[in-house]
Amino acid sequence: GIHLYIGAQCVDVAIRVIFPGWSDIPYAFAISFVAYWLLTVLVLTRGAGMLKKLESFTAPFLIIWMVVLLVWGRVNAGSWGTLISEPATISGGELRNQMLVCITATIGWWATLVLNITDFTRYSKSQKAHIIGTAVGNPIGFSGLALVGALVTSCSVVIFGEAIWDPIVLTSKINNPLFVVGTLLFLGAAEITTNTAANAFAPCMDISTVSGGRLSFKQAVWIFGVAALLTQPWKLMTSPALYGNAFLVCSGGFLAPLAGVNISNYIFIRKTKLDLNALYDPNGEFAFKRLSKYNKPFTMILYVIAAVLVVLGLVCNKEYLSMTSAMGLSMRLS
């Protein structure tokens, strides 16, 4: 849902640049949101092949866009702003707690891919290929994006007199309509690949699989698309605290037990060895019907404990406890 909102913003701002009167139309953003949601669902119904083609097209552009924004900010501001020279406002235990909250929220953002990364790595040419791609691409890409975001936001304070952290708003302020429209449309396309790959593809596969063949992948996509609307991203994005501390930390806390069970099962019980054929055999050792009498009670125990930890963490303003504790405890129970 969050990526749908961001992508819809790209479309909406691009239309406003081309047609300034667009903002006067009632429910203009709602129209942009529904159109972008429909486009995302249609792309996802085409499967992994379509995602790979679109990702190959948009990923290089994101790197170029980051560099352009960085150069533009530095040239127009004449410096990197106050970010580098400004003294720290927090330290000690408070700094540690805030860092752990940010780390937990970041892990929560990646939680869906942690659980379903095999839906993508199975397309890798080799084990070595996906290990190198993940080890090199993720740290460099994620760190680079964070650094550019911080530096450009700092430059915006000098240029506009206020900190503009939203890259869409910042891009719209560049005095070049053609560049702005082209950039926003590319960003919208990139959001589709990011959203579907990280948050939608794997759950849709799960819905189709759990249905026992009664639902096709395309039908699962439409079901998941409707469910995404129920998260009401337009409300989540009204506050960074609501999005980061509440949504990401809570979702990460509920997904952590699943990751804990998977990790423990693979390392400690299976000793990193799996029977691949049995994984896809409906009557094999991994068949849910054979394990359901054990899964059901333990699933309830894990989720009740995880839910309590999440709520207590938020109530006590110790958000970082929510997911890390849930994951560690689930690994013990498994």
Place the predicted regions along the sequence by residue.
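C-terminal membrane-solvent junction of multi-pass transporters and transport-like membrane proteins
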Residues: 258-334
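Hydrophobic transmembrane alpha-helices that form the core helical bundles
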Residues: 1-21, 191-208
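Membrane-interface loop-to-helix entry segments
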Residues: 31-76, 134-138, 248-256
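Hydrophobic, membrane-embedded alpha-helices of multi-pass small-molecule transporters
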Residues: 36, 70-76, 88-152, 176-197, ...
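Transmembrane alpha-helical segments of multi-pass small-molecule transport proteins
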Residues: 17-45, 60-66, 102-117, 181-186, ...
